[in-house]
């Protein structure tokens, strides 16, 4: 009986800590961006629309432009490539 009470106590403590840490919350992104847990390490920008990363092919979590748009580094927003300055 004591063993089961201890297991229940551990589960309650872990669940409480996880809910307080907000690990299940998906970050809110700016307009025209979507959150990805594994986005491109070198996303396309107006300045470099077809980046050739010499890095190891890794990904990073964050907010990225939705498909079809690229980042305008001067304005910090995602726009159609045809609108790049």
Swiss-Prot record:
Which chain regions cross the lipid bilayer?
none
Q: Which residues form the signal peptide?
A: 1-21
By its UniProt entry, which InterPro entries does this protein fall under?
Ser_inhib-like_sf, TIL_dom
Q: Spell out the disulfide connections.
A: 29-63, 38-59, 42-53, 46-84, 65-78
Where in the cell does this protein reside? Secreted
Q: Name the UniProt key words of this record, in alphabetical order.
A: Disulfide bond, Secreted, Signal
The highest taxon in the source lineage is Eukaryota
Report where it is expressed, by tissue.
Expressed by the venom gland.
Q: Where would I find the TIL domain in this sequence?
A: 29-84
Quote the cellular component terms of the Gene Ontology held in the record: extracellular region
Give the protein's function: May be a phenoloxidase inhibitor that stabilizes or inhibits venom phenoloxidase while it is stored in the venom sac.
Hey, which family's this protein in? Answer: Belongs to the serine protease inhibitor-like (TIL domain-containing) family.
Query: What is the protein's given name?
Result: Cysteine-rich venom protein 1
């Amino acid at each position: 009986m004591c063993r089961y009470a201890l297991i229940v106590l551990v589960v309650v403590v872990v669940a409480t800590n996880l809910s307080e840490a907000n690990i299940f919350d998906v970050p809110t992104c700016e307009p025209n961006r979507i959150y990805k847990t594994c986005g491109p390490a070198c996303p396309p920008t107006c300045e470099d629309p077809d980046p050739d990363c010499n890095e190891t092919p890794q990904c990073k979590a964050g907010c990225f432009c939705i498909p079809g748009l690229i980042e305008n580094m001067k304005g910090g927003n995602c726009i159609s490539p045809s609108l790049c300055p």
